[in-house]
Amino acid sequence: MSVLEQLGGDAQAGTTSGARASARTRTFSWHDPAATAAEGLKLSGLEYIRAIAAGELPPPPIAELLGFQIVEADEGRAVFAIEPAEWMYNPIGMIHGGVAATLLDSCMGCAVHTSLAPGVGYTTTDLQVRYIRAMGERTGRVLAEGRLVHGGRRTATAEGRVFGEADGKLIAHGTTGCTIFA
């Protein structure tokens, strides 16, 4: 069985005629991110992330685009979930590595955010990702867990893991550095 077939793809569908004949579309919508961010400035980072998780505030556009959700948030920790889908595939028939990188950037950044006071923000300064195994539709639901490693006044670091919910197998892991600004 090919890697493509193991991940849920069809090795025979990769022909030019098959690819051209099966065009698909996908649409999504989102809320004004500036309005959501303005509301978030009134809340602690943990309150803000939990409000998004509870549906009290809309998720950011990137979450709507990729279809991931915050499923847990505690002080210094954030967990996201996503269902791998065909539209996320790269040219060789598996989920594009940018999906795992985005999940890691999001869960680690939100882990940092949960430690911040109202009105304090952050931005990613660096992101390192290590890929362990490929994702496909057959992988099933995937979780991304970020944990705060260091939370200072000016900088913070976090680590994260992306893994299959059903089997716990590690897909990717990473670290991030963030600049804190008030």
Located regions from the model:
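Terminal targeting signals and extreme-terminal segments of soluble enzymes
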Residues: 1-182
